[in-house]
Structure formats: C-alpha cells, structure tokens
Amino acid sequence: YYMQTTGNKRHALVMRAPNADLARDPRWGRTEESFGEDAFLTAQLTIASVRGLQGNHPRYWKTASLMKHFLANSNEDGRDSTSSDFDTRLFHEYYAYPFYKGITEGGSRAFMAAYNSWNGIPMSIHPCLEEITRKQWGNNGIICTDGGALKLLIEAHKSFPSFAEGAAAVVKATTGQFLDAYVPYVKEALEKGLLTEVDIDKAIRGNIFVALKLGLLDGDNSRNPYLSIGKNSTETPPFMTAEARRLAREVTAKSVVLLKNK
C-alpha cells in the first residue's frame, strides 16, 4: 500500500511473494529471497508470510500473496529450460510441500509457475497445475506464468512450433495470467479452434475470485477496510510506524545465523 501516495495512486494488489521454492544450490540467483532447503521450515515461513500479507479479515485481503516459483527451479545454469526429474513422492513430501502448506494452511490462492520442466513437461503447461493444485489442494485462485515463459515454451523447451499453440496449452492448463504479450496469440488460438471460450473462462475464474477478495468488484460502496490505507497523506503508513520499524529491526537481528567451518 506504499503505492497509494499522491504521486502514485494505486496499491499493490498482488504481491509476488513469498518465494516458496526450495534453495538447494547457493549459486541460484533467487537464493537471497528464499527460506532455504528445509521443506518443513520453508513451509512454516511461507504460511506465516502469506497470512501476514493477506491479513485476518473474514472477507477481504490486504493483498493477495502469490507464491513462486512452482517448482524445483533452484538450479542456476539452464533454469529457464532444463527439466527437474524426480518421482511423485519427492514432489509431495519435498519440492511441493511449502506450496501445499501455503495454500491449505496459509490461505494463499495464487502462485507463479516456474520456467523449468518437471519430468520433461514445462511447469507452465504441466497437468499438475489443475490436477493437483486445484483439484486436490483447493487453489481456486490465480496461476500465472513467469516473465518470458511463453517465449521459452517455444524457443527453449521447443514444446510447440507456434506461439498460438503454446498460448493455448498454457490456458488449457488453467493458467489465467501471462507475464508476456499474449493477446494476439490467444486470439489466434481461439480463431483456429485450438482454444474455446470455455477454456478461457475456466482459466480466468481464479482471477475473478482474487479480485473479489481484494474488493475490486465492489464499486464505490466497498466495505473493504484496507482500501483506505495510504489515502490520507498525513497518516503514517502501517509499515513506517515506530512499532513496525522496531519489529523489523528485531526480526532482522534474530534471523542472522552464524556458520563456522570446522
């Protein structure tokens, strides 16, 4: 809500955080924003992060917590196109566990699919997006691609010969948001019969659910208590209060871990 200022009157409705992927290689470029390689610890911190971002109002969220990057994307070399290969037990008990807990206990209803493949199928089109995260875990919200994923699907993974076919596969996987230019390709896929409007409706249903939780469809008489945060230019933002600053310092100090080579 720091964006609800006089110079920039809009708020961050979807926060692309936390990073619930497991950091197994320190060379990975996203290690600094992760919680480490321990699945249980990462799951617990993911739950806490999601709850903190979304708040405890019975109807509305402060912001939507969009976890990333689903999943097993912690190798640095070739992480935009390689395949992470492991069985379903490792999927459920290790790599997917923080995301599972973020949804079922934390209450997140949004995540970003990773660039890589799992067992040869790119995550942006993987059947597990619908079959596991939606049908088994109950994610009825947003699934989005990472930036450039559609292009990588064609040029790096070489899964499809055309962008229209790639876009159709992404939508059919119930992914409702692209972080790429996608409109021309989705339109082409629709015109060529690669997609139906039913497919599109199914994919974007979760976007509408999240919009409802954020009060975006309420109109002028919204009862969302969070919409007023930051509108009063004389009011101190919640994250800038003395208590918030004190807590941030305490958390930072207590999170430092010293390691000794022996």
Positions of PLM-derived features:
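Glycoside hydrolase catalytic-domain context in secreted enzymes
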Residues: 1-262
